[in-house]
Amino acid sequence: MEKYENLGLVGEGSYGMVMKCRNKDSGRIVAIKKFLESDDDKMVKKIAMREIKLLKQLRHENLVNLLEVCKKKKRWYLVFEFVDHTILDDLELFPNGLDDQVVQKYLFQIINGIGFCHSHNIIHRDIKPENILVSQSGVVKLCDFGFARTLAAPGEVYTDYVATRWYRAPELLVGDVKYGKAVDVWAIGCLVTEMLMGEPLFPGDSDIDQLYLIMRCLGNLIPRHQELFYKNPVFAGVRLPEIKESEPLERRYPKLSEVVIDLAKKCLHVDPDKRPFCAELLHHDFFQMDGFAERFSQELQMKVQKDARNISLSKKSQNRKKEKEKDDSLGEERKTLVVQDTNVDSKFKDSKVFKIKGSKIDGEKVDKGNRAAVSMTVGPSHIKAVPSTSLRDCSNVSVDHTRNPGMAIPPLTHNLSAVAPGINSGMGTIPGVQSYRVDEKTKKYCIPFVKPNKHSPSGIYNMNVTTSVSSEKNLLQANKKRGEYSKTDVRLPELNYNHLPELRALEGIARNSRLIRKENKILSESRIPSLAAIDLHTPNIAVHQVSGSPLSDGSEADSPWMEHQH
């Protein structure tokens, strides 16, 4: 039973319950009847064994199909095809009765299914609206064969029969132990009027009340049944009810046609020996008029085939769904493998990148880089190849030299202006001049050959002195508000140390400019150096910056010391 998924309870009774389930393998929806612990209850075991035995030998389009039988933990499980609709559901939906044509089709199939059972000497004994299933295509299927049994041999008696009272024949009510197929025909007669009028024909509250309703509509019981009644200890001290005023079917249901009344009366004959067989009922005028029987037989075959196709399509749809789920799971596994592949050791990731972006050097260095690219361990340390990187490539990169003591330094490019041609682009300044109000994105930069936490000595603050002064002069003249000065006067703005912390070393220059302003001295031409980020502690770099010459190879002395281990 592990291959079935429980989808909910359909119904339950005295001997067990019916559950709606799904086959996990095929996806087919089934109905599973779970009996109570049959090993502890002989009656439950008897009913389960009887239904299993009968349904295994019964295969018909108007009988529910038994698919599988299994036993688990003293319980029997019967797996049926699932049909979630019954005639009782129709009657609850249409309390005033069903359409005549619908009833005609239902009755034809009910009689056809019961006739098939009778042809195999099996009586159902519990025909009622809730035991008659209707598929989506309108195919009727009899179910619940728990009370069904084979006909007794001559002289053999049946056990006590307990079923739904409203559809019970008179011979069953009085306790006759020799009954036969006619009990099912009686139940058919009760269904005829109930489906057309929407109300049960004999809704008795007790067995004696049931007998009273039958006798009032159909007359007195036959002598044999009356004798059995008075011999039955169940009715000891009770007399058969006297009928003062009868109410036949014609008077009770005046709207029903004569053909329908005739069909019901033949099925409801008080003498079971005078009730017709199912084959005779199928030839009744109710089914033969207008060629209904022949026409509907062909239609019924199409309905059965349609149901079979629906089951097949359901299986295929479920199989496609399972295949899609498998494909999705395989896709997820592939994604997981890709993620795992991208999360490999950084040695291999570095080797893949550097093989593509390696700098063009002589053949000997290439061979060394390739050997380093596979990240082979030589001694206690690792040797890694590093690509040549421009200033533009390292705009947001920080190099931790303490964590990478063995990193090799690529050859430096001497023309630094060519290395970083786009640094000043988009800043709104004249060529060669870099405004100290830099954009937030350009405040952080890194050059692999400069110590961390230290600004670059080239490029950004490499300016023309004369051009810088004239630009600052124009800015100061536009902001001048007080006093009259000569056109050649220059006022230096107050420096904000938040922007250029490196300018603290130039306080002397700013102080001299304020003294010049107080003395109102006229300057013919200002030769004040640009407010560049000059590192006074590295005179070689400062000299090259002021003169505008490129950084010589001697600047490598200011690069972080790297130890090469072989």
From Swiss-Prot:
| Cellular-component GO terms for this entry | cytoplasm; nucleus
Task: Give the main EC class.
Answer: transferase
Q: Do you know which InterPro entries this protein is assigned to?
A: CDK, Kinase-like_dom_sf, Prot_kinase_dom, Protein_kinase_ATP_BS, Ser/Thr_kinase_AS
Q: Which segment of this protein is annotated as the motif [NKR]KIAxRE?
A: 45-51
| Bias (Basic and acidic residues) ranges | 320-334
> Is Repeat tagged as a keyword?
no
Q: Name one GO molecular function term.
A: cyclin-dependent protein serine/threonine kinase activity
Pfam families named among the record's database cross-references:
Pkinase
Q: Which residues form the active site?
A: 126
This one is known as Cyclin-dependent kinase-like 2
Query: Which species does the entry assign this protein to?
Result: Oryctolagus cuniculus
Upper classification of the organism = Eukaryota, Metazoa, Chordata, Craniata, Vertebrata
